Amino acid sequence: MCMVILFDQYNLPTDIYEIIFATTQQVEVAKMLINEMKVKGGEIGKTEMSMFATALHDGKDIEIVTGEGPFRKKKKENISYNKRQFYDRILTPMKTMGLIDYDLYKKTYKISEKFNKNMMRVGLMWLQDLRKPPIK
């Protein structure tokens, strides 16, 4: 599986999730997942992940903040996300990009810094290609 990230360097969102995910619902679900993992010390088990996905499938209340600066508004909203789609569109891409690691032996998901290292590697690949002589 290959994830493609397209962004406009002149209108780069300040929120990393908005760069990675296509829809606002995916952004909210990804934020909820990372927050849940942070609350649990950055690591959750396979069963806890399944319970999180089931809770999303059944519907979960969240607080959404809209607007900028002093004009921010908070509103409560119920978010529901299909369990299979959660694994396909949120968790699997986060694992393949290096945002989340899965330990096969401990059967746990852990927040990872590999995404940052991979992005630096992509930048270096671009610089190397830039410095290559032209093809004749």
Predicted regions and their residues:
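Long, low-complexity, charged/polar intrinsically disordered regions in eukaryotic proteins
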Residues: 1-42
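Short, amphipathic alpha-helical interaction segments positioned at domain boundaries
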Residues: 114-136
